[in-house]
Amino acid sequence: MEFDYTCARWRRLRHAVLVAAGWRCQYFRRFGRMVEADRVHHIWPVEEFPEYAWCRWNLIALSLEAHMKMHVPGGRGLSELGEQLRRRTIPPDRR
C-alpha cells in the first residue's frame, strides 16, 4: 500500500516537523549551514517500515538537496548516507 503524502494527517505532521526544526535543514545544520527545509524525510523508509510512518522520531526536516542525498537516484531506496542515518536512528521498540 502506498503512503498518502496528500492526506490532511500527513500535512499536519509534516508542518509540525518543519516548525519544530525552525524550517531549517537538519542535515546541513550539522555543518553550520542555515538552509531552508521544505521536505520531511522518513529515516526508516515507509515502504519497508509502515509501522513507523507516523512516528515523530522517524522524521527529519531536510532541504531538497539534502533529501536527494538520502536517496539513490530515482528517489526510491536509501543511499549510503541515508542508510547511515537510519543505522544511527534506533526505533524505541528495538532498543
Predicted regions: what they are:
Residues 1-20, 74-76, 81-95:
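Nuclease and nuclease-like effector domains acting on nucleic acids or nucleotide cofactors
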Residues 8, 13, 21, 46-49, ...:
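Surface-exposed loop/turn and secondary-structure junction residues enriched for glycine/proline
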Residues 9-39, 63:
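Short cysteine-rich loop/turn motifs with clustered Cys
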Residues 32-33, 59-84:
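Short Cys/His-centered divalent metal-binding micro-motifs
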